[in-house]
Amino acid sequence: MDVVEFRPTPDQFAWTFGGVAPTHRITPGTALRLWTEDAFSGRLQRTTDRPSEVLVMTEVNPQTGPFYVEGAEPGDTLAIHIADLRPARDWAASTTIPFFGALTGTDRTALLQEPLPERTWIYQLDRAAGTVRYEAKNLSLDLPIAPMLGTVGVAPAGREVRTSLVPDTFGGDMDTPEMRAGTTCYLGVNVPGALFSVGDGHYRQGEGESCGTAVEGAMDVTLVVDLVKGGAPAWPRLEHDDDFAVVGSSRPLEDAWRASQVGMVTWLGELYGLDPLDAYQLLTQISRSPLANVVDVNYSAVTLVDKALLPPAQAYGGIHAHLRSVAKGLL
């Protein structure tokens, strides 16, 4: 198995999906050991830092990549297995940004109100305990870390170039806590080589990412990348040992939810030979629907189905179990 290590310098970050030359060409089955910068490009370091003063808004959500996967063609399915996610710093940051977040007026939800005050929180990491420290004026809490990647995506179709702040059919900034170690992410390939990137590490995040920023931190990332010929899903699919999941992204929020639901109806049909109405009925009785983000240009919703409620099925020929086995040798 080939193993590629890459720690990008600031001039090597990608800020978009599409429109960026690949940093590496890899073959299916390659393992990647990567470093990702936090969503703020490391610029928020103190509680006195104000986003309007220290952030460059064209340089947020830096991505590591893109990677060109040999043999990947439009219509294929890229399988990205997250083997390991480890905080790369002993601190992380979260903040309120003017006109950004679920509970404030924004450029798209215009309200006659002033922006919320800017405030920055710095979370100190206790590696031994596996916690981050939330500090407020009247409360301090140690919260368990739950590392995840906010952003995983491929180049969009139709020569589109999309900012790394947008989730859509190509993946992107989905911000779902389901994108964690042990997850295999299936993305439809839109361009030769797929051109996938990852980034936006979170040390933990609640469902919905309400204020718009999680516990944002640099991350050491280990992936195994493989390719399935054909079978491209319309929306990103995730597989854990315990669940199947589909992520839909759109506005309004109910359309993001609908996209994830329709995506799961389609997947259940593929896995079990169900017609759409039978799959629709089954989905109605067994699915769970956590929110991923309600703050980005598109919102993201997740539809999850517990494998324990279903007969055994091998999605994409059982590639999740294969990649999980391969990943064990990297840890």
Located regions from the model:
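Intrinsically disordered, low-complexity linker/loop segments enriched in Gly/Pro
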Residues: 84-180
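Short, Lys/Arg- and Gly-enriched loop/turn segments at beta-strand edges
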Residues: 39-50, 85-96, 193-203, 292-295
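N-terminal, Lys/Arg-enriched amphipathic/low-complexity engagement segments
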Residues: 1-55
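Conserved mixed alpha/beta catalytic, RNA-binding, or beta-rich assembly cores of soluble enzyme
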Residues: 145-254, 265
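Short, well-ordered loop/turn sites that connect or cap secondary structure elements
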Residues: 26, 69-72, 179
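A generic structural signal for residues embedded in beta-strands
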Residues: 34, 77-80, 187
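Short, structured beta-strand/loop micro-motifs enriched in basic residues and often containing a Trp
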Residues: 7-17, 57-64, 162-170
